[in-house]
Amino acid sequence: MKRKVLLIPLIIFLAIAAALLWQLARNAEGDDPTNLESALIGKPVPKFRLESLDNPGQFYQADVLTQGKPVLLNVWATWCPTCRAEHQYLNQLSAQGIRVVGMNYKDDRQKAISWLKELGNPYALSLFDGDGMLGLDLGVYGAPETFLIDGNGIIRYRHAGDLNPRVWEEEIKPLWEKYSKEAAQ
């Protein structure tokens, strides 16, 4: 009886180790857990009413993301180290004329305002999602995440993780150009 009881922890350990090795093998084969497909691709941005980050009392709705041209919706927070890493690249994209709307996610408003003053503000508009409800509606599970939204307010792409030159050039820019051309017609 004691021998059987002693085997139970060993069996549990082996099962956990096997699951871990299986997931590592999937990741090595290119199964990237950050590339989770969004159920919202091809669907309109969820309706929302959010306050401006830097102008409390000023509210915005989903129509700020449907202005006839594509927009990047960047979900960020001061508690997110990867957001800091991607921030300078967002400043560069903004300087190139790429419209970026920021959504500060589950954060302290004053810290976020100070952070933008310190690092520069790439956002044409900064929304404050302090309770995370729009993030929940978008399926956000962490920051940063970036959504490409076409001029009609349809979500066309979602990227979880930092937006960097490789991600922009290989994944988002071709779609940005496609939807920019469609908007110009």
From Swiss-Prot:
Compartments where found: Cell inner membrane
Keywords: Cell inner membrane, Cell membrane, Cytochrome c-type biogenesis, Disulfide bond, Membrane, Redox-active center, Transmembrane, Transmembrane helix
Membrane-related topology note: Single-pass membrane protein
Superkingdom, taxonomy of origin: Bacteria
Membrane topology (Cytoplasmic): 1-4
Membrane in keyword set: yes
PROSITE patterns according to UniProt: THIOREDOXIN_1, THIOREDOXIN_2
Chain coiled-coil ranges: none
Membrane-spanning ranges: 5-25
Entry's Gene Ontology molecular function annotations: disulfide oxidoreductase activity
Intervals, Periplasmic compartment: 26-185
Effect after changing C83S: Drastic decrease in activity
Gene Ontology biological-process entries: cytochrome complex assembly
Disulfide partners: C80-C83
Record-level GO cellular component terms: outer membrane-bounded periplasmic space; plasma membrane
Domain Thioredoxin: 39-177
Protein family according to the UniProt entry: Belongs to the thioredoxin family. DsbE subfamily.
Task of the protein: Involved in disulfide bond formation. Catalyzes a late, reductive step in the assembly of periplasmic c-type cytochromes, probably the reduction of disulfide bonds of the apocytochrome c to allow covalent linkage with the heme. Possible subunit of a heme lyase. DsbE is maintained in a reduced state by DsbD.
Matches recorded under NCBIfam families: dsbE, PRK15412.1
Name used for this protein in its record: Thiol:disulfide interchange protein DsbE
Source organism of the structure: Escherichia coli (strain K12)
Gene: dsbE
